Amino acid sequence: MKFVLVAVLAYLIGCINNAYIFTKYTRNIDIRNYGSGNAGATNVLRVLGPKAAAPVFVLDVLKGVVAVLLGKYFIGMPGALIAGIAVVCGHNWPIFLKFRGGKGVATSVGVVMTINPLLGLIALAIGVAVIAITRYVSLGSMTGAITFALLNIFFPNSVQVLTFAIVLALLVIFQHRSNIKRLINGTESKIGQRAQIK
């Protein structure tokens, strides 16, 4: 029963969509109607710029941190892992926004940095490096998620943590499936390219 409660609580925390809330109350727009249509920090960056995206990113990271800490408090590491997946699912598919949320990257950063700070930091550094080199946020995001999963293979903690890392990476990749198509076609937007607000 505790596992279910932790999962539901973490999911609801994830459903607090900071991109939607921030842009709705500061610009009176639904961020999902602009740019990529994604309710996440990257799309806020693309549409409104870094000053608007920064608080959204930080708050999304904190969602992951809070959910994992709550899960760990109630059930230990198994609870942390369940909460980590659930909070990302809440961010991606928020019930309050008709299941149209973000892609879970910033929230995943908070999750992995709380579960395994060292491996999380390495994965984050590699992801950021890919973004800096290629200018593709999507490619860096997927690279970071895959790196975290691979690191858990080479530096195993437990089967549960490895399974968690693989599931998390699959969630990130799944949410970027349209980006993958655009990357292949050469039409993916690079960081710094701004979308127009009509």
Curated annotation (Swiss-Prot):
NCBIfam families recorded: glycerol-3-phosphate 1-O-acyltransferase PlsY (TIGR00023)
GO-annotated biological processes: phospholipid biosynthetic process
Protein family: Belongs to the PlsY family.
Pathway(s) served: Lipid metabolism; phospholipid metabolism
Full protein name: Glycerol-3-phosphate acyltransferase
Alphabetical UniProt keywords: Cell membrane, Lipid biosynthesis, Lipid metabolism, Membrane, Phospholipid biosynthesis, Phospholipid metabolism, Transferase, Transmembrane, Transmembrane helix
Membrane topology value: Multi-pass membrane protein
Function summary: Catalyzes the transfer of an acyl group from acyl-phosphate (acyl-PO(4)) to glycerol-3-phosphate (G3P) to form lysophosphatidic acid (LPA). This enzyme utilizes acyl-phosphate as fatty acyl donor, but not acyl-CoA or acyl-ACP.
Reactions that this protein is recorded to catalyse: an acyl phosphate + sn-glycerol 3-phosphate = a 1-acyl-sn-glycero-3-phosphate + phosphate
Cellular component, GO, one term: plasma membrane
Record EC number: 2.3.1.275
Transmembrane segments: 3-23, 65-85, 111-131, 153-173
Localization terms from the record: Cell membrane
Record has Heme as a keyword: no
Native organism: Caldanaerobacter subterraneus subsp. tengcongensis (strain DSM 15242 / JCM 11007 / NBRC 100824 / MB4)
Predominant location: membrane
One term of GO molecular function: acyl-phosphate glycerol-3-phosphate acyltransferase activity
Name of the coding gene: plsY
Subunit structure, interactors included: Probably interacts with PlsX.
Principal EC category: transferase
